Amino acid sequence: MAHKKAGGSTRNGRDSESKRLGVKMYGGQVIKAGNIIVRQRGTEFHPGFGVGMGKDHTLFAKIEGVVKFEVKGAFGRRYVSVVQA
């Protein structure tokens, strides 16, 4: 009897596409207006001086300058700013 029984169905075999989140420009790097600094879900980093936030919480430079990361406030919030070089 050279027959093969039907294989059972599997519940695996799927995976979502990666979203490429994270820091795109690091502290001390020169940046132009409109460049993306951080792609994130929620406000892991908050916008500081010279930085805007998109509707998906992406942080981007509003002015040309140098990226600066800092921790401020009683809650230890992390802020990203752009300071003019």
From Swiss-Prot:
Annotated GO CC locations: cytosolic large ribosomal subunit
MF terms in GO: structural constituent of ribosome
Region of interest (Disordered), residue spans: 1-21
Keywords annotated in UniProt: Ribonucleoprotein, Ribosomal protein
Biological-process GO terms, alphabetical: translation
InterPro entries xrefs: Ribosomal_bL27 (IPR001684), Ribosomal_bL27_CS (IPR018261)
UniProt keyword Methyltransferase present: no
Coiled coil region boundaries: none
Recorded superkingdom: Bacteria
Record PANTHER family: LARGE RIBOSOMAL SUBUNIT PROTEIN BL27M, RIBOSOMAL PROTEIN L27
Family as reported in the entry's similarity comment: Belongs to the bacterial ribosomal protein bL27 family.
Entry protein name: Large ribosomal subunit protein bL27
Organism: Ectopseudomonas mendocina (strain ymp) (Pseudomonas mendocina)
